[in-house]
Design a protein with these regions (language model features):
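A short alpha-helical cap/connector motif
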Residues: 1-105, 109-158
Length: 158
């Protein structure tokens, strides 16, 4: 992210739990607006002290939620890490990417889910990269998928 550090970006993370990663993004991307969506509000008061962090307390995987969101440059799925939620993430949020924006899906469980998610993402783009951390972590849920939008957002059907 070094080349993006000083740019004005819209960044969204789904699954914010204690809010630590939003605070990290807020500190690193000094000119960006950071959005976080979670279905629990126990951390919202703490995050309200950061003017560039916007929190939304809802089910992030409901398509209706995305209608009123702006376009983003980076969208990270750190939600429940289920195949079902990750497929919904691709289908609901790819359309919310600016040109060259990227979706990041963390903690993908095993090769089977990676193949399923690649298949789903290929409906939108061929620019899909897998990052495999399994040899470093010795667990099966250490795959990440990066999906990039190569189209101008206004060409995407909502």
């Amino acid at each position: 992210f070094f080349d993006l550090k000083d740019k004005k970006l819209n960044i969204l993370e789904i699954g914010i739990q204690y809010g630590s990663s939003l605070v990290l993004w807020n500190e690193y991307f000094k000119n960006s607006i950071i959005y976080g969506i979670d279905n629990t509000d126990f951390i919202k008061d703490r995050l309200d002290t950061y003017p560039r962090i916007k929190t939304i307390i809802q089910d992030a995987y409901r398509k209706e939620l995305t209608f009123n969101l702006p376009l983003f440059d980076i969208i990270i799925d750190d939600g429940p890490h289920t195949l079902e939620s990750q497929i919904k993430f691709i289908n609901n949020y790819f359309k919310k990417l600016n040109k060259n924006g990227k979706l990041f899906i963390e903690d993908i469980d095993g090769k089977y889910n990676s193949n399923e998610l690649r298949k789903e993402a290929s409906k939108f783009t061929d620019n899909i990269t897998s990052i495999d951390f399994r040899s470093n972590t010795n667990t099966e849920d250490s795959l990440m998928l990066v999906i990039q939008n190569d189209l101008d957002a206004h060409y995407l059907v909502t």
